[in-house]
Amino acid sequence: MKAQLCILLIALVLFQTFSQSDAILSAIWSGIKSLFGRRGLNDLDDLDELFDGEISQADVDFLNELMR
């Protein structure tokens, strides 16, 4: 029973880490961008198009409403 509880807690921590990794990486990336300035990294802003484009603005608004 103790082993199952430990495995469950470790899995929860790993899932939480995975779900928050995007926020951490975006914060690090914005810090790097501010260090080098906007002019040096203007062309790298095109990487935003790599994300899934099927999420509409209405979906984003709905998710923002849920997070309030």
Curated annotation (Swiss-Prot):
It is found in: Secreted; Target cell membrane. Residues 1-23 form the signal peptide. GO terms for cellular component: extracellular region; membrane; other organism cell membrane. Its main location: secreted. The modification Phenylalanine amide is found at residue 36. GO terms for biological process: defense response to bacterium; defense response to fungus; killing of cells of another organism. The keyword Secreted applies. Expressed by the venom gland. Residues 38-68 form a propeptide. The keyword Signal applies. Keywords: Amidation, Antibiotic, Antimicrobial, Fungicide, Membrane, Secreted, Signal, Target cell membrane, Target membrane. Belongs to the non-disulfide-bridged peptide (NDBP) superfamily. Short antimicrobial peptide (group 4) family. Negative results: does not show antifungal activity against Candida glabrata (ATCC90030) and Candida parapsilosis (ATCC22019) (MIC>400 uM). This is Amphipathic peptide OcyC1. It comes from Opisthacanthus cayaporum (South American scorpion).
